[in-house]
Amino acid sequence: MAKGQSLQDPFLNALRRERIPVSIFLVNGIKLQGKIQSFDQFVILLENTVNQMVYKHAISTVVPARAVNFQGVQENDDTEEPEAGNI
């Protein structure tokens, strides 16, 4: 599994399982709202009054309506900031 998928899939799956309403902002600024019905490598199926298939490459941000508890893979990616004095 690609490193990017190790966080994305558990996050989207938690949103789908718990049926948490989301706002999805597209790269062109459009805001879509609904619940994630399904997703795969390339698209998210968003459920509202109608179902919309949204291509992931068009998505800028996914904002849940409430906090999400999910178990993403925790990897040491060496992006921690140095402690004070260790610059």
UniProtKB/Swiss-Prot annotation:
CDD domains linked: Hfq
KW Ribosomal protein (keyword) present: no
Subunit structure: Homohexamer.
InterPro entries per UniProt: Hfq, LSM_dom_sf, Sm
The gene coding this protein: hfq
NCBIfam families xrefs: Hfq, PRK00395.1
Biological role stated in the UniProt entry: RNA chaperone that binds small regulatory RNA (sRNAs) and mRNAs to facilitate mRNA translational regulation in response to envelope stress, environmental stress and changes in metabolite concentrations. Also binds with high specificity to tRNAs.
Keyword presence, RNA-binding: yes
Residues spanning the membrane: none
Family as reported in the entry's similarity comment: Belongs to the Hfq family.
GO biological process, one term: regulation of RNA stability
Protein name per its UniProtKB record: RNA-binding protein Hfq
GO cellular component, one term: cytosol
Gene Ontology molecular-function annotations: RNA binding
Residues annotated as domain Sm: 9-68
Pfam family, any one: Hfq
Keywords carried by this UniProt record: RNA-binding, Stress response
